[in-house]
């Protein structure tokens, strides 16, 4: 019996060693691939940027006419002038001013090209190297920085002068500083809060994501110092207590942001800075389903496998009445909480226009009997893809990690709940179906998500103990490249005239 036990222990140890080696190989492969892809992406982006500026849209495009116009005022020294049509604070224009004043001394480009360059630099240098790369080492088996650098909803705006790129860089950068603490805990938390505050100068709703970062900051320290366990309500109380006990070092930096934003609200009377009549907040609950639909679509390589689909089918079979009531509930939400903004139906320069006109809102059959089950499945994907990756806590024993910097980038039930709440708070009040609003909900969901090592089409009997994520991560990268290629082709080959615009118009996200 002793010999059998020894043999079994030896076999188990060999499997653990093999798994450990496979994980190391995956991490090394990921690093090598990301380093190799970056110069290729940089070269491709340079070509696309050249086509944007010299061929396709060598003039301010859609919202650029407002952004460029305001930046030109700053370049002329007219800092007190403001275009009342602009809805966001002036963060983008300060960056554009800085790029024009510095890079403009070295090259003879026109002002529009220089302003667009600020987003190219942000999207292909700052975003992958200074924001995603540090997070990658906390969850190296989950995502590739190169892949999130070509996330389609974000990539489209690398070549235009829009607020989304730097808004994303700064608020996700706030999370990066809070997790990686590169300057020591106190200085890093303050730097994180400052990044979060600066992000609100690009998009006001980023104040909500400041709250998400604060939750992550608190939970990563509370689970160590207070000892999270399997009693979830108890963990929430521990987090609140730890926040009160460490108010000055952990909470105060973000509380300053919330206080400043409250002052802004009282002064401005609205979240929207200008053109308030066209951006009135409401209760557009269907917007959450639009968001989950996009998340499901973009994350297909992450969750798609036979067992995942079978789990959804088995759930509907085992709980048919419950599933029917859920879908009926979604239909009721579609019926009573759908907002069709006039801009959506009037602007055929956005893919959202065609999605709504041809699919989502084409007729009652598609709207209710096709889209409701799709929304139901998207909700399942959003929730179930995360479930296996959430921290598991022992009923009694504390976790072995002693420092927050040694924790992986992983959800607990608290941060997972916070992400859902923050997503609701940022997308539901918006009356406009605008895919750009889903960038941050997707990014924050994706970077915490562990990728299943299960092969795409494997049946349970074919499963092995071999660990491997490279194939899925590679497919995810190629999936994004394919989507980007299609959207660029659509943009390049579909030019049409508007009576109210002097230049040709094109189609973007």
Swiss-Prot record:
The chain crosses the membrane at residues 27-47, 112-132, 134-154, 165-185, 197-217, 247-267, 285-305, 317-337, 379-399, 413-433, 439-459, 473-493. GO terms for cellular component: endoplasmic reticulum; endoplasmic reticulum membrane. The keyword Plastid does not apply. It holds the Pfam family DIE2_ALG10. It comes from the Eukaryota. It is a multi-pass membrane protein. GO terms for biological process: dolichol-linked oligosaccharide biosynthetic process; protein N-linked glycosylation. It catalyses: an alpha-D-Glc-(1->3)-alpha-D-Glc-(1->3)-alpha-D-Man-(1->2)-alpha-D-Man-(1->2)-alpha-D-Man-(1->3)-[alpha-D-Man-(1->2)-alpha-D-Man-(1->3)-[alpha-D-Man-(1->2)-alpha-D-Man-(1->6)]-alpha-D-Man-(1->6)]-beta-D-Man-(1->4)-beta-D-GlcNAc-(1->4)-alpha-D-GlcNAc-diphospho-di-trans,poly-cis-dolichol + a di-trans,poly-cis-dolichyl beta-D-glucosyl phosphate = a alpha-D-Glc-(1->2)-alpha-D-Glc-(1->3)-alpha-D-Glc-(1->3)-alpha-D-Man-(1->2)-alpha-D-Man-(1->2)-alpha-D-Man-(1->3)-[alpha-D-Man-(1->2)-alpha-D-Man-(1->3)-[alpha-D-Man-(1->2)-alpha-D-Man-(1->6)]-alpha-D-Man-(1->6)]-beta-D-Man-(1->4)-beta-D-GlcNAc-(1->4)-alpha-D-GlcNAc-diphospho-di-trans,poly-cis-dolichol + a di-trans,poly-cis-dolichyl phosphate + H(+). Keywords: Endoplasmic reticulum, Glycoprotein, Glycosyltransferase, Membrane, Transferase, Transmembrane, Transmembrane helix. GO terms for molecular function: dolichyl pyrophosphate Glc2Man9GlcNAc2 alpha-1,2-glucosyltransferase activity. Pathway: Protein modification; protein glycosylation. Glycans are attached at residues 53, 268. Its main location: endoplasmic reticulum. Disulfide bonds: none annotated. Belongs to the ALG10 glucosyltransferase family. PANTHER family: ALPHA-1,2-GLUCOSYLTRANSFERASE ALG10, DOL-P-GLC:GLC(2)MAN(9)GLCNAC(2)-PP-DOL ALPHA-1,2-GLUCOSYLTRANSFERASE-RELATED. Dol-P-Glc:Glc(2)Man(9)GlcNAc(2)-PP-Dol alpha-1,2-glucosyltransferase that operates in the biosynthetic pathway of dolichol-linked oligosaccharides, the glycan precursors employed in protein asparagine (N)-glycosylation. The assembly of dolichol-linked oligosaccharides begins on the cytosolic side of the endoplasmic reticulum membrane and finishes in its lumen. The sequential addition of sugars to dolichol pyrophosphate produces dolichol-linked oligosaccharides containing fourteen sugars, including two GlcNAcs, nine mannoses and three glucoses. This is Dol-P-Glc:Glc(2)Man(9)GlcNAc(2)-PP-Dol alpha-1,2-glucosyltransferase. The lineage of its organism: Eukaryota, Fungi, Dikarya, Ascomycota, Saccharomycotina.
């Amino acid at each position: 019996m002793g010999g059998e036990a020894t043999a079994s222990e030896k076999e188990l140890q060999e499997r653990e060693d093999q798994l450990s080696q496979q994980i190391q190989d995956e991490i090394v492969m990921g690093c090598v691939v990301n380093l190799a892809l970056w110069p290729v992406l940089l070269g491709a982006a340079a070509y696309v940027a050249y086509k944007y500026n010299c061929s396709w849209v060598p003039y301010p495009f859609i919202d650029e006419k407002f952004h460029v116009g305001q930046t030109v005022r700053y370049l002329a020294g007219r800092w007190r002038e403001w275009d009342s049509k602009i809805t966001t604070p002036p963060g983008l224009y300060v960056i554009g001013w800085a790029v024009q004043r510095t890079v403009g001394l070295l090259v003879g480009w026109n002002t529009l090209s220089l302003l667009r360059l600020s987003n190219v630099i942000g999207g292909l240098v700052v975003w992958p190297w200074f924001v995603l790369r540090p997070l990658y080492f906390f969850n190296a088996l989950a995502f590739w920085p190169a892949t999130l650098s070509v996330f389609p909803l974000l990539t489209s705006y690398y070549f235009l002068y829009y607020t989304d790129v730097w808004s994303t860089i700064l608020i996700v950068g706030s999370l990066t500083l809070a997790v990686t603490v590169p300057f020591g805990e106190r200085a890093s938390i303050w730097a994180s809060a400052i990044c979060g505050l600066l992000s609100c100068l690009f998009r006001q709703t980023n104040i909500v994501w400041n709250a998400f970062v604060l939750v992550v900051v608190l939970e990563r320290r509370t689970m160590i110092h207070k000892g999270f366990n399997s009693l979830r309500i108890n963990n929430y109380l521990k987090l609140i207590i730890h926040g009160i006990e460490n108010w000055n070092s952990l909470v105060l930096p973000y509380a300053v942001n919330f206080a400043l934003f409250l002052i802004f609200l009282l002064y401005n009377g609205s979240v929207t800075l200008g053109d308030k009549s066209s951006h009135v907040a409401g209760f557009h609950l269907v917007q959450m389903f639009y968001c989950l639909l996009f998340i499901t679509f973009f994350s297909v390589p992450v969750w798609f496998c036979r067992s995942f689909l079978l789990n959804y089918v088995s759930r509907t079979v085992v709980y048919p009445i419950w599933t029917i009531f859920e879908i009926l509930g979604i239909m009721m939400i579609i019926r009573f909480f759908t907002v069709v903004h006039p801009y959506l139906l009037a602007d055929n320069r956005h893919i959202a226009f065609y999605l709504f006109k041809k699919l989502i809102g084409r007729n009652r059959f598609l709207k209710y009997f096709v889209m409701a089950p799709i929304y139901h499945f998207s909700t399942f994907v959003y929730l179930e893809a995360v479930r296996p990756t959430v921290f598991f806590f022992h009923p009694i024993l504390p976790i072995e990690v002693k420092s927050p910097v040694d924790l992986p980038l992983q959800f607990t039930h608290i941060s997972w709940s916070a992400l859902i709440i923050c997503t609701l708070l940022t997308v539901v009040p918006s009356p406009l179906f605008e895919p750009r609003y889903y960038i941050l909900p997707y990014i924050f969901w994706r970077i915490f998500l562990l990728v299943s090592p299960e092969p795409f089409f494997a049946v349970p009997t074919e499963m092995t103990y071999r660990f491997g994520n490279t194939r899925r991560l590679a497919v995810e990268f190629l999936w994004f490249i394919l989507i980007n290629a299609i959207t660029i082709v659509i943009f390049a080959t579909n030019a049409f005239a508007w009576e109210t615009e002097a230049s040709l118009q094109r189609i973007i996200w």
